[in-house]
Amino acid sequence: MVFCWMSETPRPSFLDELRQRSEALQAQRAAARLPEEEARHAIDGALWRAFRWLDEAMGHLEVIRPDVRHRFRLGDYLTFDALQIDSGFAAFRRHGLGTGDRLEHVEMFYRLAATKPAVVRVSPLAAASVEERLRAAALHFHSEAEIDKEKVVRNTVFHVEPTIRASVRFKPDYRRRAIDVMLRNVDRFESVLLEFEPTAVDEPALEDLVRLVLGESNAFLHRAPLAHVNSRRVGK
């Protein structure tokens, strides 16, 4: 009887084991990075397209200066209507050096002009609250005390410039793979935050945004979930 002894397979060295584990993890991470990089490219592409479109649109609106159908109210003491686009532009901000085309945000700024300044007359006790709300609404103003013949302050009078400063900011959130759109003073004295999928920031959405600015439609507000409404609603 002949016995044949099979040679044992050499056990991998400790360094070989580390190498195998390292290579496996590198492969997993590379596979995970691929959709992440694709998501980043989708977000950056959407932001650049939005900037180019808004830059041209605001240039045309600044020339045309169309009427705006919104009515802006602040409490029961100030109302601006009969508005029109006065000026506006689009801008962007990049991330730090070495980040390529990655954008920190895209923003559209514009001003609405009313026909005449507003005058708000309130009691001295209400003056501090009114001043705070005027500042929160980004309105420019100056105030003076109204004094009677006995040198007693009867009212505080605010002279408010007939200009509403508004903005729309597109800010990427790469972790959530979303684009947050912050509207400030667009259709009221208030800030609203919407959360968009990158693919949803397309030309039809931007068209709806301009229609919202002009007061022609509020369809833009229904294109994405409402992420946040500023806890201080300055218009009420």
Annotate each predicted stretch with a short phrase.
Residues V2-K236:
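A composition-biased, non-transmembrane "mature-region" signal
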